[in-house]
UniProtKB/Swiss-Prot annotation:
GO terms for biological process: L-histidine biosynthetic process; methionine biosynthetic process; purine nucleotide biosynthetic process; tetrahydrofolate interconversion. This is Bifunctional protein FolD. Transmembrane segments: none annotated. Keywords: Amino-acid biosynthesis, Histidine biosynthesis, Hydrolase, Methionine biosynthesis, Multifunctional enzyme, NADP, One-carbon metabolism, Oxidoreductase, Purine biosynthesis. PANTHER family: C-1-TETRAHYDROFOLATE SYNTHASE, CYTOPLASMIC, C-1-TETRAHYDROFOLATE SYNTHASE, CYTOPLASMIC-RELATED. Pfam families: THF_DHG_CYH (PF00763), THF_DHG_CYH_C (PF02882). It comes from Dictyoglomus turgidum (strain DSM 6724 / Z-1310).
Length: 281
């Protein structure tokens, strides 16, 4: 059986570092504060917000909420973002998805203040990532790096295959790995003969959003498998990789739940503390 790369010890290490930084800022009279912006009603978005609130409250980060009805105009939304940019007591801003069609069409995320963009979704932060400059990294891709670093799995010179090309995971993750001198192949729904790529990977990262998509016939001996998928099947959280099928064939594998997901919220907190430093400078 392959070694299971549990996310919990990674999260605990990061949490310890985060708490130390929070105490430092509080000793300077600064209370790290995240503003969560929600438009309309969505049960999944609200559940996500509450999970952040619960963890952040536990470690000493202040949370503010701004809720708006789905009729809010793009002009008014832009004004709100400007107010949050100018509010020195707010260090980070997180906009929950989904947004109403008008806001999505109007690229509302681009009104986020760049130095408070704790999810790294603005064009400026994504551009900085592209050229390898200091920026806020999207949380899930950074969580993958934190896990690889913790378990001392090098990526330099490695053949890494990323299955999935979303702007929130696949694309930024491929750039982060490229910046670490990995050799990257990005596969997606239009890739022909996908199995030829997945079986040859030294490190296979799956973020395609399809439960149990990768089975034993798609992996090779001795691989590192990172499952970024979060899908609900019969009321249970499952990954994009069929864990039970694959675990005995590969060298390392992350579980779902208990893998990347538990690290992601800690990365969000790390990004907020990075924003505190920028805002308070």
């Amino acid at each position: 059986m392959g070694v299971i790369l549990e996310g919990k010890p990674v999260a605990e290490k990061l949490e310890k570092e985060i708490k130390e930084k929070i105490q430092f800022y509080k000793s300077q009279g600064v209370i790290p504060t995240l503003c969560i912006v929600k438009v309309g009603k969505n049960a999944e978005a609200e559940a996500y917000a509450k999970s952040i609130e619960k963890f952040f409250s536990k470690i000493g980060i202040n949370i503010e909420r701004k809720n708006f009805n789905e009729e809010i105009s793009l002009v008014d939304f832009k004004k709100i973002m400007k107010e949050l940019e100018e509010d020195s007591a707010i260090h980070g801003v997180l906009i929950l998805r989904p947004l109403p069609e008008e806001l999505e069409r109007g690229k509302a995320f681009q009104f986020l203040p760049t130095k408070k963009d704790v999810e790294g979704v603005t064009y400026e932060n994504l551009g900085r990532l592209l050229v390898g400059e200091d920026s806020f990294h999207p949380c899930t891709p950074q969580a993958v790096l934190e896990l690889l670093d913790f378990y001392q799995i090098p990526v330099e010179g490695k053949n890494v295959v990323v299955v999935g090309r979303s702007i929130s995971v696949g694309k930024p993750l491929s750039l982060l790995l490229l910046n670490r001198n990995a050799t990257i192949t990005v596969c997606h729904s239009k890739t022909k003969n996908l199995v030829e790529f997945t079986k040859k990977a030294e490190i296979l990262i799956v973020a395609i959003g399809k439960p149990y998509f990768v089975g034993k016939d798609m992996v090779g001996e001795g691989q590192v498998i990172i499952d970024v998928g979060t899908n609900v099947v019969d009321g249970k959280l499952v990954g994009d990789v069929n864990f039970e099928e694959v675990k005995d064939k590969v060298e390392y594998i992350t579980p779902v739940p208990g893998g990347i997901g538990v690290i992601t919220t800690r990365v969000l907190a790390m990004n907020l503390l990075k924003a505190v430093k920028k805002v308070e400078a």
